[in-house]
């Protein structure tokens, strides 16, 4: 691990085998009986933009994780049962989820019958006993999360496609890598080093380009031959679109919802704003990135080419609800400036062996 990089966290382990059925049913009944004003109709999964979040992404569970690690499963479950009426504190994905719900509110005002909205799913390997406290916390914060997947110790990744997941956020890097391998857009989310106030009315999402929106083709050139060869390669292939990266589909989903506001003449008032924040240089390699987005029928509201400069200070000005990058040092730099950053474990940069293999294979070209 490089100095200053965030530690990779893992989800708490499974609970005990015996489910607290009465507690679960009581909490679920309360949730189902919420007034219709607070509880709009849930969309069909195949029509919605589905965001799956883990329990430790949505809420802070540091003490619970410590108990599980140091004292084991039984003590962990006992602690959760004793504190199930105490809501968890918000975690790193909490402001992002609140912003998604703010967008949904605007969409329902404009399109009352449309199911083309965000649908948030709580995806966790916790046991149903812990689920009671999760439901109580969701009710406490007036979150609209109706779909739960609690797998009692098994990995929930196999269920992501069944939930039509467009994006999966977790504090467990192993599960995120598993999701990426399954072709699901996913990222490991980290808490910032300090709290920063973010917009309550506009969802702001910032993306790195290479190995996030785009494939890692260009990074392979850099690893194998250096920057000079990379600039030559990008110039020669300026009009050839890059292959898609793991989060291209999520940007596409955001763009689809943005167009619903544009069609109502609300482009300037759109509650979704997207940013491309890349280390590429505009003059030498920026055109290919923009032309690739254009070839997909996509765009970002802002495109920021930093030519290798640190991303943290710029992100501090943008104040996105989440920033996606494949490089851990960019994630750490964003954290230091108060940005909720998420690591996308994709591409040649994730594995030194892959980088060496890329250098060997590209050396023959």
UniProtKB/Swiss-Prot annotation:
UniProt-recorded name of the protein: Cytosolic 5'-nucleotidase 1A
Any single Pfam family the record assigns to this protein: 5-nucleotidase
Location in or out of the cell: Cytoplasm
Function: Catalyzes the hydrolysis of ribonucleotide and deoxyribonucleotide monophosphates, releasing inorganic phosphate and the corresponding nucleoside. AMP is the major substrate but can also hydrolyze dCMP and IMP.
Spans annotated as Disordered: 1-23
Notes on activation and inhibition: Activated by ADP.
Reactions listed under catalytic activity: a ribonucleoside 5'-phosphate + H2O = a ribonucleoside + phosphate; a 2'-deoxyribonucleoside 5'-phosphate + H2O = a 2'-deoxyribonucleoside + phosphate; IMP + H2O = inosine + phosphate; AMP + H2O = adenosine + phosphate
Active-site annotation: 208
Keyword list, A-Z: Cytoplasm, Hydrolase, Magnesium, Nucleotide metabolism, Nucleotide-binding
Domain of life of the source: Eukaryota
GO cellular component: cytosol
E.C. no: 3.1.3.5, 3.1.3.89, 3.1.3.99
Biased composition annotated in UniProt, kind: Basic and acidic residues: 1-11
Cofactor (UniProt): Mg(2+)
Principal place of residence: cytoplasm
Any GO BP: amide catabolic process
MF terms (GO), sorted A to Z: 5'-deoxynucleotidase activity; 5'-nucleotidase activity; IMP 5'-nucleotidase activity; magnesium ion binding; nucleotide binding
Family the UniProt entry places it in: Belongs to the 5'-nucleotidase type 3 family.
Source organism: Mus musculus (Mouse)
Lineage: Eukaryota, Metazoa, Chordata, Craniata, Vertebrata
InterPro entries: 5-nucleotidase
């Amino acid at each position: 691990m490089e100095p200053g990089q965030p530690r990779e966290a893992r989800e708490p382990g499974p609970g005990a085998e015996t489910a607290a059925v009465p507690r679960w049913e009581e909490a679920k009944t309360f949730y189902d009986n919420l007034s219709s004003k607070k509880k709009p109709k849930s969309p069909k999964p195949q029509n919605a933009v589905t965001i799956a979040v883990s329990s430790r992404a949505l809420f802070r569970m540091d003490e619970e994780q410590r108990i599980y690690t140091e004292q084991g499963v039984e003590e962990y479950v006992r602690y959760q049962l004793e504190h199930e009426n105490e809501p968890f504190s918000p975690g790193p994905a909490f402001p992002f989820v609140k912003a998604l719900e703010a967008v949904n509110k605007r969409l329902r005002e404009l399109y009352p019958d449309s199911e083309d909205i965000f649908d948030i799913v709580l995806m966790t390997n916790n046991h149903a006993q812990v689920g009671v406290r999760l439901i109580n916390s969701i009710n406490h914060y007036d979150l609209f999360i109706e779909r739960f997947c609690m797998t009692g110790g098994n990995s929930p990744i196999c269920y992501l496609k069944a939930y039509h997941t467009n994006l999966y956020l977790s504090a467990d890097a192993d599960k995120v890598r598993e999701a990426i391998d399954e072709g699901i857009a996913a990222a490991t989310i980290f808490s910032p080093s300090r709290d920063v106030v973010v917009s309550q009315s506009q969802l702001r999402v910032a993306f790195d380009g290479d190995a996030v929106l785009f494939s890692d083709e260009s990074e392979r050139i850099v690893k194998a031959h250096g920057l000079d060869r990379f600039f030559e390669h990008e110039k020669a292939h300026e009009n050839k679109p890059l292959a898609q990266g793991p989060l291209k589909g999520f940007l596409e989903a955001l763009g689809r919802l943005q167009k619903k506001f544009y069609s109502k003449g609300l482009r300037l008032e759109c509650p979704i704003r997207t940013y491309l924040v890349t280390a590429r240089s505009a003059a030498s390699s920026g055109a290919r990135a923009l032309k690739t987005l254009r070839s997909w029928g996509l765009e970002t509201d802002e495109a920021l080419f930093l030519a290798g400069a640190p991303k943290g200070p710029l992100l501090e000005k943008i104040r996105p609800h989440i920033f996606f990058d494949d490089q851990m040092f960019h994630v750490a730099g964003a954290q230091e400036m108060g940005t909720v950053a998420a690591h996308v474990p994709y591409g040649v940069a994730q594995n030194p062996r892959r980088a060496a293999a890329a250098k060997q294979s590209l050396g023959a070209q």
